[in-house]
Amino acid sequence: MIKSYVIDTNILIQAPYACQCFEENRVILPLVVLEELDGLKKAEGEKGANARRAIRFLEKLRLKGDLLKGVQMENGGILRVEANCVNVELPESLPEDKPDNRILKVCKGIREEEKPVVLVTKDLVLRLKAQILGIEAQDFSTEQVIEEEGQYSGRQICYVAEDKFKEFKKKGVHLKELYLSDEDGNKIQPELTENEFIILKADQSVKKTHLGRVEGKKVVSLEFRKSQPYGIKPRNAGQYFLQEALMKSAEKAPLVIVKGMAGTAKTFYSLAVGLEKVLNNPTGEYRRILICRPNAQFDQDIGFLPGDEQEKISPLMRPIVDNLEQLIDSDEEERYQDEQELQGKIEEIFARGLIQTEAMNFIRGRSFVKTYLIIDEAQNMTPNQVKGIITRAGKGTKIVLLGDPNQIDRPFLDERTNGLSYASEYMKGSPLCYQITMSTEECERSELAMDAIRRL
């Protein structure tokens, strides 16, 4: 059955190619959507760029035919601009001059002739109003991944026979030797993914554990389990796995995805390895550490803020500097005598260009070579932004995506549509991607913080 999908502006602002994702159905753009795209085309950042991409796509279709009558797209669907439905009545409580309500008028006006009609929007309130008016509404699902509980964690606990357990560090263990137990105590074969981290337990003594990683048809021991990057020693299994992923060369592990709640040392450990690789590595594996954080306030583009680039992004980078202060002042033997001396050391590192910070808006279109690139708070990125970063990685560059899918501050994103979860699910199984999700038990915050997390 052919459906008519009415597209809201916020869909095109996040996914400018969205019109091509509805198969051989009708795609309806209310005229007010074009008005909103026109008003956004000069905006700085991702919003303006996507508005321009959507407009260019519509211009290509305009050259092929009459958009008011409908133009066929490459996927077989028909795109049409709807300029009518101005006389459709809405409840008095819905002002007719509001763009969202004009979109509702289009949905209501065309459904008599073009059933079924589906409104596609990321606006939760608009979906609620649509339901009240008897209009089917949904989110844009093409970029949605599964619910967070079922998303790839990058780690598993598996069991193995005692004799195989004893041989693990020397020989590793074949995947077919690993097993899990179901509810009835029966042994079942685990589903494992390339580069997945394993907590290996001996079946006769489950308190004994080894840590490993899936490589081909075997689980192998961690290569960097004895490392202490920048003097930092891992405190739990998650940090050992994180260290392994970060210490691997850019050739073997050019992409690392780390998910977990605040306090699990995601940023701290990533910076520690970066400092070790850039400051203490004579081979010059990386030229610099580049740190970026997305501006969660999507409607407040950083380009409008006063000052130069570094002044603009300084508030965004304050948590990064806090971690740097803790790392640089962590050596008991070389602890700095006062705050001024510590700040002087940090300023020296920045002045030498060994650590650089940039806002996401300023790195679009650039390629990075021999760079240790940390993207903090990546859950506030769109899938399109993450794709743009990963596909720009130059030779010798390592990209580290950090974030918590449960702490999203950006409008129209959730735990299923954010860029971090999107990259995690689609890069699962890649031999070039290492992933780890830190557990709640691995949080290194104070007892008060942990108690508050449980209670509040």
Protein language model regions, located:
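Conserved coupling/interface region of RecA-like P-loop/ASCE motor cores
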Residues: 39-70, 423-456
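Pre-Walker A (Motif I) flank of P-loop NTPase domains
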Residues: 251-257
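Conserved P-loop
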Residues: 268-343, 411-431
